[in-house]
Amino acid sequence: MADTFFFTPSRRLTVANVAELTGAKLLNPEFSNIVISTLSSLEGAGEGSLVFVEHRKFSDALLGSSAVAVFCTNEIVFKVPESMAILVTSTPQRDFAQIGRILFPDSVKPMPWFGQREISPYAHIHPSAKFGHDVCIEAGAVIGKNVEIGSGSLISSTAVIGENCRIGRDCYIAPKVTVQYSLIGDRVYLYPGTCIGQDGFGYVGGASGIEKVPQLGRVIIKDGVEIGANTTIDRGTFEDTIIGEGSKIDNLVQIAHNVKIGRYCLIAAQCGIAGSTSIGDMSQLGGSVGVADHIVIGKCVQIAAGSGVMNDIPDGEKWGGSPARPFKQWFREVAALRNIGKVKKEKR
């Protein structure tokens, strides 16, 4: 269950409220007045717990669960115990998350580390900086010359915002974040240790050694983007590095200079995207994917974890392996290798 020491529910909902808010169909109306007070996993459920089951392979766990209500699809209904309210929906996890945001709004809205929304007298702020209303800047933050920060944004202790940067409305800049040479939209969350706008890895070799190439572009992060802890995004060499609207980037990701990431992309931890690569809207990269430079990845592409992308990928395709290739080809090759191993073992 949710830890009530850190996360206190803001309200209580009945099962009928939950059905109305999400549009789910309540199959057993006699449970309408049951109170939902928390979210849980199937195994950790207790009094007042709401759970979800999206895939049939997890449905057996319902039998031993103490949850009072479950979001599930039509195909799982017959597995649900009679003691649970059944909320049928085609998107159980999405509806579960929606109710979570209603019950625990503080869990998705970053709060000031010191509990007060104010501009601290112990922040280091250049006199030319401009702020919208209800901006919070905590002690130890550094705000450079000509910086502009939109209404409702929170700049945490030890964050550094470099000269001329723009931060939009309702943004969250966590501790130890550095932002330079960047324009950041509204509702952008940068989690601890993120570095935005530093030099790209631009060097050229010659007889006299390695020379640095000036990095003269920017980073542009559009509305609704979230960037995980200790991720780094380099500014462009001449063109901008761009992160598209609504994209979510996990912890420990490296995005090199001139990269263009489209709208609503998902990039999991430890990915590395080399310079001047572009990724189309709604594409997804699993953990530890490496992408070579100047690659074009289309829209709605899925790339399996641990893959190494060395070639362009058309729209809508699923690739995996290293070097990455279409799923069907990759699976055939893996199966062939497995069979070779079996033959050798039999000969022994």
Curated annotation (Swiss-Prot):
Catalytic activity: a UDP-3-O-[(3R)-3-hydroxyacyl]-alpha-D-glucosamine + a (3R)-hydroxyacyl-[ACP] = a UDP-2-N,3-O-bis[(3R)-3-hydroxyacyl]-alpha-D-glucosamine + holo-[ACP] + H(+)
GO cellular component: a single term: membrane
Active-site residue numbers: 257
Protein EC: 2.3.1.191
Entry keywords, A to Z: Acyltransferase, Lipid A biosynthesis, Lipid biosynthesis, Lipid metabolism, Repeat, Transferase
Keyword Transferase: yes
Domain of life: Bacteria
InterPro entries assigned to the protein according to its UniProt record, in alphabetical order: Hexapep, Hexapep_transf_CS, LpxD, Trimer_LpxA-like_sf, UDP_GlcNAc_AcTrfase_non-rep
UniProt xrefs under SUPFAM superfamilies: Trimeric LpxA-like enzymes
One MF term in the entry's GO annotations: N-acyltransferase activity
Swiss-Prot/TrEMBL GO biological process terms: lipid A biosynthetic process
Metabolic or biological pathway, per its Swiss-Prot or TrEMBL entry: Bacterial outer membrane biogenesis; LPS lipid A biosynthesis
Classification via HAMAP family: LpxD
Sequence similarity: Belongs to the transferase hexapeptide repeat family. LpxD subfamily.
Name listed for the protein in its UniProt record: UDP-3-O-acylglucosamine N-acyltransferase
Species: Bartonella quintana (strain Toulouse) (Rochalimaea quintana)
